[in-house]
């Protein structure tokens, strides 16, 4: 059983380059007096980023599934009212029925799944029809880059992002052609994502 060795290796990593980049970008945006939404998939990432930002003196809050509805509303309103600068959440919790586009125009995607609906819904939290012409809206996609067995650079995050873009193109084509296309299974998604890794 290598569980303890693996745990030690993971703990020895410290802060990843992806997380450093996310924190640095967030700090830059906050210093420009911009509010930021950071999208994650994993609760541990949400909590870790919040703790790191707070240690940097940046006011941040997180909304995750265990947060009661009335508390979600209060936290969202506090974000809109400027009581904190960064909202960290996930699309399972906050991707629908929340409008932040009047106060926030920067979203950082620290983690993302290959569920296109989650991506599109989360993007819509800071961008809506009816925004002022020329309104700035910016999405940032964090990516960890590794070397595969051939020492070629490889990014799982980039593979997931490219898969999402493919799905979006298929969706838009289906809308334009008024014709549904077959959808990919999770197994096909994984096969496409991992094909360049090994």
Enumerate the language-model features and the residues they cover:
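Hydrophobic residues at beta-strand termini and immediately following loops
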Residues: 63, 110, 142
